[in-house]
Amino acid sequence: MEAEEAQHGASPPISAIEEFSIIPEAPMRSSQVSALGLEAQEDEDPSYKWREEHRLSATQQSELRDVCDYAIETMPSFPKEGSADVEPNQESLVAEACDTPEHWEAVPQSLAGRQARTLAPPELWACPIQSEHLDMAPFSSDLGSEEEEVEFWPGLTSLTLGSGQAEEEEETSSDNSGQTRYYSPCEEHPAETNQNEGAESGTIRQGEELPSEELQESQGLLHPQEVQVLEEQGQQEAGFRGEGTLREDVCADGLLGEEQMIEQVNDEKGEQKQKQEQVQDVMLGRQGERMGLTGEPEGLNDGEWEQEDMERKAQGQGGPEQGEERKRELQVPEENRADSQDEKSQTFLGKSEEVTGKQEDHGIKEKGVPVSGQEAKEPESWDGGRLGAVGRARSREEENEHHGPSMPALIAPEDSPHCDLFPGASYLVTQIPGTQTESRAEELSPAALSPLLEPIRCSHQPISLLGSFLTEESPDKEKLLSVL
C-alpha cells in the first residue's frame, strides 16, 4: 500500500487546499460533497481506503486544473450573463478528461509543481485588455516552502470574492465581449500606456480606431525612421484637411491652385482677344475713312494712291484747315466724274485717230504704193521705190515664164466687206495655185487695226498697185500694160 502511494505521490491534506482563498465556490462545494461520501464509506470496506485516497487526489488535481483552465478560457472575453451557468459544463468536461490514467501521470504531484503550472501557460502573460492589472496574492504551503507571490487575473478574484465590483467590471467589459482581440507578448511602450489611459473610461469612442502605425510600433515591426516619416505624412494630411470634416476636402489646396492657374490662363486669353478686336476695329476704321475721303477707290492707280497718302500726311502736318479743304475737293459728285471720264475717252480717241493716220501715210510712202491725188506732192520720195519696183517686176516675169501668167485681181472698194473699217486699203488676191506672191501690200499697221468709233467713208477711186512700174527706165513697159 505504501509503495503504491509512493508511486502515485502523497496527497496533501484538505486543510492545505482550503487555504487557497482564490479557489471558486463551486469547486469547493463539489470537493466537500465527495469528501463526505468517502468518510461515510470508510468503515464498510477496508480495501476502499486506497481508492478513497486515489480518488481524493484525482479530484484535487481536477479542481486545480479546472481553476487554471477556467481562468484561461474566461479571460479573453467576458460573457454578458454570469459565469455560474458555465461552471457545471466546464467541471463535467474537465472531470471526464482527467479520469484517464494517462492524464494522471502527466499531472505534477508536488505543490510547487502545481504552482509552477498555474504560472506556466503563455496565455496568462498576454497583454490585458484596457487597463486590467494583475493581482498579487500571497501564498504559503504546509510543506515548508517560502511564501511566494502568485499572479492572478481580476476575473478569478471576482469569482471568489463575489463582490459588487466584479459585477460592475463584467457590465463594462460585456460591451466589448463580441470582439476578441489577441495581442503579442507584453512590451512596455508609450503607445500602450496611452491606450490604457484612454480606455479607463470603460467605453471606446465611436469613429476612432487605433492607427496602423501605432499597432505596428507596438508589435515592433517599424523602424524609428519609418515612424517619423509616417508621422510627418499624418501632419501633412491634417494640414490639408484644415477645418473640413474627416476625409473631406483632403486636397483643397491643390484644387484651389489648379483653379487659380486656369483662371489666369483664361484672363490672358481674354485680354489677347480684346487686343486683337481693337486692332481689327482700328484697321477697319482706317479703311472706311479712306473710302469716304477718296470717293473713287477703283479709278486710282498705285502711284496716285501713294501721292494721295503723301498729300494727306502733308495736310496733317499743315493743319486741320487744309485737311478740311482737301476733303471738300475730293468729295466730287458722280456726275462730274462721269463727264470727266467721257472727256478723257474722247481725247484718247482723237489722239489715236491722228496716230493711225500718220502711221498709214508713213507706211504707204515706205512701200512705194502711191495713193491717187498724192503722186504729184512728193516726187522725190519715189526714186528708191522705182528701183525696187523694177526688180520686183523682173522676178514676177521669171515666175510667169515658169508657172504661167498670174492674174492679179483688184477688188474694188465698193465690193470690199472691210471697206468701212479700213479705208484706203486694197487687197491683192491671187487664186492661181502654185504661185508665190508678195503680200507686203496687204500687211497693215497695228494702228489701222484699232477700232474707230466714227465710221470713215471709203474712197471709190481704185488704187493702182502697179503705178510704180510705169517708169521711163522700165524696158518691159508694154508687157506690163498688156497684162493689165
Curated annotation (Swiss-Prot):
Bilayer-crossing regions: none
Bias (Basic and acidic residues): 266-278, 323-368, 394-404
Phosphoserine-modified residues are S184
Matching InterPro entries: ARHGEF5/35_N (IPR029212)
Q: Where is the composition biased (Acidic residues)?
A: 299-309
Question: Keywords, A to Z?
Answer: Phosphoprotein
Q: Where is this region: Disordered?
A: 139-418
Q: Which Pfam families match?
A: ARHGEF5_35
The domain of life for this entry's organism is Eukaryota
Bias-annotated ranges (Low complexity): 217-237
This protein is called Rho guanine nucleotide exchange factor 35
Q: State the organism named in the record.
A: Homo sapiens (Human)
Encoded by which gene? ARHGEF35
